[in-house]
A protein has these predicted regions:
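Loop-to-transmembrane helix entry/capping segments in MFS-fold secondary transporters
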Residues: 92, 185-188, 254-260
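Membrane-water interface segments at the C-terminal ends of transmembrane alpha-helices
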Residues: 6-39, 53-177, 206, 210-227, ...
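Flexible interhelical linker loops that connect adjacent transmembrane helices
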Residues: 280-309
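A short amphipathic helical element positioned immediately N-terminal to and/or at the very start
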Residues: 42-53
């Protein structure tokens, strides 16, 4: 009996996985090696030096808060846009603006927001010009409040949301055709559910699993961004990713080791936050199931959420 010859194509997945895993493993080893060996001229290792840095916990908190908040807000805006405007003429206008805005680099978008939101930016200049035209006296000095580089990272969250919503919208467009959304929406409407509640109970459970990996990518990027955090985020202390980029450029072995240790901490934070997000998914599934069983149609939610989706949609694509 002749043996069945295996096609070379059968080994393609193994080769592809190896090509992806080996560079990552080499990078992890290069990152871990400064952490594992003692730092020359120092009595303590890289991790102990990192723990002794006073800005570690604020930097970690800033990375966690900005990453999670930007992802949640961006996903909520995307879901509201699809729940309310998918199939409408205004939604087609949104889609025409997605691709060009998606091509804008993150640093460019952050600089544009700086020119707009700064205390001496275009918004405040426009307000001053308007008041002067109306004959209302107003100070020419920029207001004494922080809009960029605020300690809470609100400007960074806003910039991340503006940049990531088009990406999530594009991912939803790619997955929308596989959800049989028109039929599901028709059935929900026939059962008396409002547009928002019907979308939440019938379309979103099918659409969301196809968005999980893009959402994870947005969450990981929002926690580890360097360029946008340097422009929009606080600097004393900065986010953990920005501090790593500063340490890695210094020639001293101490800072090289601290950068490697901080990179390991950053990787752990991202992995932990992905697990937290998965837990939030399970909670959301339980809430949706309870809402589905209580029989409340929820059509009264359409008005407020329509306003929310329209306002933030215009901000995101304008």
């Amino acid at each position: 009996m002749s043996k069945t010859r295996r096609s070379p194509i059968a080994a393609a997945p193994i080769v592809l996985i190896s090509l992806l895993v080996l560079p990552v493993a080499a990078g992890l080893w290069a990152t871990m090696s400064p952490v594992l060996r003692p730092i020359s001229g120092q009595d303590q290792g890289a991790f102990m030096s990192l723990w002794s840095w006073n800005g570690l916990w604020p930097a970690m908190r800033l990375s966690l808060v900005t990453g999670l908040a930007a992802t949640l807000i961006g996903l909520a805006i995307t879901a509201a846009l699809f729940a309310l405007f998918q199939g409408h003429r205004i939604f087609r206008v949104f889609l025409r603006l997605v691709a060009p805005f998606l091509a804008v680099p993150h640093a460019t978008a952050a600089l544009a927001l700086t020119f707009i939101l700064a205390p001496s930016g275009w918004i405040m200049r426009g307000v001053v010009t308007l008041f002067n035209a109306l004959g209302i006296p107003i100070s020419q000095t920029p207001p004494d409040f922080i809009t960029i580089n605020d300690p809470g990272g609100l400007a960074l969250i806003f910039g991340l949301v503006i940049k990531e919503v088009p990406f999530l919208v594009l991912m939803c467009v790619a997955a929308w055709g596989q959800c049989d959304a028109p039929r599901r929406r028709l059935v929900a409407s026939a059962l008396g559910y409002g547009r928002i509640t019907g979308f939440w109970l019938t379309i979103w459970p099918v659409l969301y699993p196809q968005l999980r990996l893009p959402i994870f990518a947005v969450l990981a990027y929002s926690m580890t961004t360097v360029d946008m955090a340097m422009i929009l985020g606080p600097s004393l202390p900065p986010s953990l990713a920005v501090q790593i980029s500063k340490w890695i450029t210094l020639p001293e072995p101490l800072y090289q080791g601290m950068a490697a240790a901080a990179a390991v901490v950053q990787l752990t934070l991202v992995a932990a936050m992905l697990l937290v997000w998965r837990f939030l998914e399970l909670m959301g599934r339980a809430i949706s199931r309870a809402q589905f069983q209580n029989g409340i149609r929820g059509s009264s939610l359409d008005g407020p959420i329509k306003f929310f989706g329209l306002v933030f949609g215009l901000v995101g694509f304008g």
